[in-house]
């Protein structure tokens, strides 16, 4: 206490006994991908689209990072860390808005087509490198005679496959489908529209287009799994994100661009996605948004989810199918992986409703169409295995229609439960830092109980916890039972917290019965 030696009035500041816990943010995303310029392997914060363009350049044809970041901000995201992997350090420190950078941003993947080959009333040409061939085969199942399957192979490996039709104006028209989905070939009409017909079953070998400059091969520019995984000591790849605490969502949209170009196969895709999931599990405060391979129907994605990928994690969520969005680099609509838009939907949902609300039944802004229209019967097969579907509803737009993790544990089935626990854990962790080195006695235990309870009662009042009274929604225990003498002697203070989170109304069931007034209920 201070000493008072002379008469007078003294004012003392007394610390308040209450130290309120504040909720942390849950809407900061991280994107790992390719860009024509910008810092290499350095997490860079951008808070709007203009900042991204200044640091990493505009939309780049054939890559998805810029589209994903744009979709994130368009759907309500406010802050994101971007990690540029692959490429060279030549563009580091350059002004991405300079004429040279803008020119480079629009063309690194846009190689001139190779020599076109005849394919019936169509022509096909290669835009990628490698020993490419195109095979025309019969379509699966019954259907009109103009239907066929177009298979693109790099050597003996199938790298792209399209179920198409030769009938112009149809959704599956071969020219439109290849233009929107292929990164390796282009198809053009070689006859008037009335004369277009299904090509005969055949295989044609394509001559790859030559890179415009030495080393400009787009496949070579794609990083391998090791570059994505990175190293925490060197702060590269996913390892570089370990130093950024505020990240809550992670996506790797350009992984599928590398797969489409044949730079990596599905085994490498799985290795990177497993590394992404492992990173989120290691950090314990973020969730991975997984993109499926393109061009898969509901049956194929079910097989891929269960047999090929087989992921089982409460820190990851899978969304299907790909969405169609406008591509300013080509002036046309393009299919892009949904992870960037989904991360924005999560951020918007957290801001408008709270992280405790499942990020589903939300409109995907910027999506003009879907790669595949999913029926209710198909979703009946996909939803139980953790595939969150994106569906188009008449008069309601394109919406996220699933909110599950990839976990087989029923306790962590719902995505909002996992993300809400991340929010609580991080908030309590940061809000109780003052406890360290305080005297470990009953007074400290009471202060901890009071502060944590004050935080949780506000969560209950906001509708995040289940129960009609606070006692039914949570409990906080920090006393002699949780802190016996042997625990106190080693410098530990243990607080036990239990909560009852609100789970989403995933299945809304109305039971209707017919009854006659005065005569009771009528049964069928």
Walk through the language-model features, giving the residues of each:
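Detector for methionine-enriched segments
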Residues: 1, 167-170, 177-179, 184, ...
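Structured, hydrophobic secondary-structure cores that serve as assembly/anchoring elements
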Residues: 1-97, 108-129, 141-145, 151-158, ...
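Extended, Lys/Arg-rich, non-catalytic nucleic-acid recognition/anchoring regions
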Residues: 97-100, 106, 118-197
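Intrinsically disordered, low-complexity segments enriched in small/polar residues
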Residues: 92-99, 103, 107, 213-217
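Long, low-complexity, polar/charged, intrinsically disordered or flexibly structured peripheral segments
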Residues: 195-234
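A diffuse structural propensity rather than consistent per-protein peaks
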Residues: 48, 169-171, 224-225, 230
